[in-house]
Amino acid sequence: MSKIIQAFHSSNKNYTPIWFMRQAGRYLPEYQVLKRTTNSFFELCYNPIKAAEATLQPIARFDFDAAIIFSDILVLPDSLGINIRFINNLCPTAEKIPNLLDLQKSKIQNTKISKVYEAIDIVRKKLNKKKSLIGFCGGPWTVLTYILGYNSRNTPKFHEIKSNNKHELIVDSINILTKHTIDHLANQILAGADIVQIFDSWAGILPYQEFSEYVIKPTSNIVKTLKEKFPHIKIIGFPKGAGKLYHKYTKETNVDGISCDYDLQLDEMLKLQKNVLVQGNLNPNTILSKNSKIIEESVIKIMDTLSNNRFIFNLGHGILPETPIKNVELIVKLVKNYHSSE
């Protein structure tokens, strides 16, 4: 059993497991070398050998307790035939916004997305058995925001959901994406993932009622269906920006773990920790600092607050491309040595 899986079952006062969201990627010089051997980001995602190499790079360098497969939440819509492009390498958006009715008729192109599962299989065979392998997906609502451009509550398109009577179409589309998401996660589990995480990056833009219907309901469906098939698999939810709704999300979705963003206060995480494993929530901007004392103080504060119960140390969002390697090394050292210094 991996150290991360152990953390789900009971608190380990002698060790706190650690991994980082987006730990495989642009901040690593070895990743930049690998990236130059492909023509695009998606080409790298769909090359099992190279995706596996990217996945294992941060394990080799930092000895994290888990590998997370090098992929993207947008491989799902891409495999549905929706061409996703990264504008200025930052903002992913559909090249042509599909009609919602057309989206509901879309079918998965297995020749594309199966490459992700091949990469997982390769990684699992190479990865130390004491380390977990994390598969992941985007929450159906978040994936839909990228497909349709509802990425900001202030954009007219968000308000069109109600003003143009699109609510039922949105719900139907989320239901379709939920089915595809369940299949995608199940295939990652079958390929070798022992943990899966659901990234709902745009959960926080939703009002209460829509949060319940667009985020909680499909996530609950995903968790229930996967648990029926794979009761041993651990599922982490990440409703970024949900604030006080983290509690509602945790209670009603039945996730095994909750990943918390950096805006959530530690006392709120402590409350969550009474019922579920918590993960997080160091601000990625903090580890850009040239002042190691600032980083150390932030890490120790989180560890002092949360490490005596079910807890995985992580960031409150993905690691930034400009993050200094030495700062990551410092954090890993602080977390791994924390209990021995008590």
Curated annotation (Swiss-Prot):
Write out the pathway annotation from the protein's UniProt entry.
Porphyrin-containing compound metabolism; protoporphyrin-IX biosynthesis; coproporphyrinogen-III from 5-aminolevulinate: step 4/4
List GO molecular-function terms, semicolon-separated. uroporphyrinogen decarboxylase activity
Matching HAMAP family, A to Z? URO_D (MF_00218)
Q: Where is this site: Transition state stabilizer?
A: 72
Name of this chain's protein: Uroporphyrinogen decarboxylase
Upper lineage: Bacteria, Pseudomonadati, Pseudomonadota, Alphaproteobacteria, Rickettsiales
An example GO biological process term is:
protoporphyrinogen IX biosynthetic process
Keyword DNA damage applies: no
